């Protein structure tokens, strides 16, 4: 009996020791991570996700009382956590082993598609309303301007979503746009893209549309403008990589299937010349093929997001006019199509231009203006106030 009690006591002690060792290891791990975060400079950009990362939020009484500081700090910690990429990969694989159809805001869809999940509560609706109101005011002030919003992959390719998956927020946004913006200045492409949803119009592993998807939107825009779109058959389609793994894949680090990026070229493209960022550098092509070997192959279009690209073309075959294209990254593969109708095309990204469009128009007068954004990126954008 005494031997049993001694054995039981030893087991209890061993269990406590193991528990204390586990607690100690967790504390050491968390302490080590905290020290690493202190000693390691915050990253400003994630090459894997092709986006800016959160900065350490400012601590104020107002931000704490409203809960804004806590939310921002939680996001900051999750994005700056040491070894985050490896943790994301491990967590996602475990999630999939458990049979889950979604991880880290990404649905594992049909046919190797990875589709981002959006819910109504994910958006700052005050910011959304401000952006819609500012854009509607701009359109009323500039009757020569139009707006084209690209739907997210999750809604355009809703048939690829897993069963019972739900997407929220975008429909409410489109309702606001339809109610506030002049109807004749809206170019709706939701139905256009839906009509081609069996084709390769969005990348499987990235949030962007493919060049083919951009072409179908270009057709709709050209008809709206009274132009004859360049027939698809007149382009030489050049696949330049078939190993592209995009931003959506970077969020889960598993699943999906490598994408192909294709460029649409046409005889006469040598007539174009390009000036970047008001004389920073020049080019003779819509494409920077060196980017295919880098971390972001999608940057093959114009070398990535640029503040301002001034595209000129010989007058022959154009309408002799100037187009101002105000866009996010979705406009990068759209611009080469639109530029074929103009003698000059000014491509602007508001995120990198520190002046209002009205001042820019004094330097670059435009006959036509097109605002082209992905719906969700527009909803979250904090630079739309420059549309004035």
Predicted regions and their residues:
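Extracellular glycan-modifying ectodomains
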Residues: 1-388
